[in-house]
Amino acid sequence: MKSIARATGLLALVLVLLSFLTNHDYLWGGIRETWLRGWENAQIDDLPYRDHVRSIPASSNPQPWPDGPRFGKAQPSPEDLQWLESWKTASFLVIQHDSLVHESYSRGHDATTLTNSFSMVKSVTAMAVGLAVGQGLVDEQETMATYLPRFAEGENASLTVQQVLQMRSNIPFGESYKDPFGFQAKAYYREGNRALLQPYRVDATPGTKFQYQGGNTMLLAELLDAVRDGNLSQDVAGQLWEQMGAEHDALWGLDGDPADGAVERSFAQFYATTRDFARFGQLLLDTGAWKGQQLIDRGFVERMITPIDRLTDEVDTFWYGYQIWLGSTEDGMPFSVMEGLRGQMVVTIPALDAVVVRTGYDKGKAKKRGLPTDVFRVIDVARSML
């Protein structure tokens, strides 16, 4: 028995040493916050495992959502409640005409709980690009090489900012959420996102294929750092969060120690309350304006929520815009969706003047018209209460 224990201990030591020698030591942090907690991969409640975050302070003029006339009366049906529970829903919020229609929490969450956005924040990074466009710092029709010179050679030279916004860069980052050695795991858990990006270049003519990858969002964040001082958290804090009257601080996970120049993980790890996530939906609903004040260039927001196939004839993708998912209901109502790994979503439905937020620990795998079928069910649940 002693020899078996000794051999096991030696093997463990060798594995640890190898992980550090090959720059895969990030795996141990990932294992600690996923497998050792009984999850296959990252979860919405992983904030305690973030060693470095930037704070986005609550607004100095907080604007709570007012109760609408149906608030407290509008409830999901028993069947809908069962469905929400089956996918481990943590919060469900419905807003119409700028007022609360329904708000509910479960699994220990409440109106003050901060949860991980995962990919919902890709849309926020796009909004930050929109801020730069409005300031004349970025032209989305320009090439990436204009801002990041390493893309000046070969086919890279034709890659545009718009193509990166639309996930059609043809840069082979990879987007596996189960491969612990893949690009996405390194981007989520390892330090040094910018170093991770450096070797990647296009491997086919840019613009000719839609491929959803967080690496594109990381490139957009790097572009922003090339054209302005400050960082993503400051962009959101000073130009959106304050003006939208956010009631709570948000936190954004960093890829290392800020003293060493760490940057936000621009594709995930934005932690906010459900009510404050809804503000991004309202901002989109009002085409980049908040209570009459234009925060993001209106034309940019209009293009952001326009399907790819209406802005280019290179790719016939109708369910994606600028870092945001798009669709329409069975009866023809267009909507946009900020959507994350665990089925978190901020849905904006202009025809109903409504915003719906759902957070949770799981989602279904089925798809319909390029989107998770859960999105359509969430919309149906919300509409039943309007």
Identify the role of each PLM range:
Residues 98, 115-140, 164, 220-224, ...:
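Active-site SXXK
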Residues 1-109, 135-137, 373, 378-386:
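N-terminal leader/targeting segments and the immediately adjacent pre-domain N-terminus
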Residues 247-255, 305-355:
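Active-site Gly/Thr loop motif
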Residues 134-172, 199-201, 226-267, 272, ...:
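Active-site helix/loop module of the DD-peptidase/beta-lactamase fold
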Residues 130, 145, 162-165, 198, ...:
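Non-transmembrane alpha-helical segments in soluble domains
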Residues 216-223, 266-289, 344-360:
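Active-site-proximal alpha-helical segments within enzyme catalytic domains
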Residues 86-89, 113, 341-342:
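Short, small/polar residue-rich loop motifs at catalytic or cofactor-binding pockets
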